[in-house]
Amino acid sequence: NPVLRGIILTSKESSLWINLTNISEDLASAFAEWVSDPQMRKIVMDLKNQRKLLREYGYKLDGAIEDPSLSSYMCGYIAAANRRLFAERIEDLAEKYLWIPQQEFSALVFPEEAPSLFEMPGEENLRYFTQVSRVIHELARILHFEMQEQCQLKIYEDIELPLLYVLADMEQAGIAVSDTLLNELNDTFSSRASMAEEQA
């Protein structure tokens, strides 16, 4: 299962890293209030998965107005079977919509060969993910206009995006099975099968 170590928030002018593994009560409370506020508009990549992950850590994600993962699908993009990892999809989308040559995004940050993400010093790790978050921000803007051109925007805003919240909540809640109801159904079908045999 994925582990939530922190959140990076990016605006047009700056970025903020929140370390959720060592967060004060005041900051946790402020973040919880912000992330759950539907009036605070957010761009979230993979909204359904992020909502489920944040909920596991006690946060409710609301207020997302853009999800480039969904909007790219609405515009006809389907990730290749061998390019479904998060970083790979970001690279492919950036090449398709932002004309950034396909390469590891760390190459935009590091002058030499990039180290493993698990070996990166803290500062360089943040630089890498800040770059990725800015790419996501720009993808959301471009794909919004693309959906507008394809007359997909209303469907996206009124149906598809709200549906991600429903699907996330359903997947996390799971399915409850009632033994009593199953037994009743079994008895009903068995009775009907017996009646059908007698009438045959």
Positions of predicted regions on the chain:
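Mixed-charge, glycine-rich, non-catalytic linkers/tails in nucleic-acid processing enzymes
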Residues: 62, 103-200
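Glycine-rich, acidic and aromatic/proline-enriched surface loops and short helix-turn segments
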Residues: 99
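Conserved RNase H-like, two-metal-ion catalytic cores of nucleic-acid enzymes
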Residues: 1-96, 174, 190
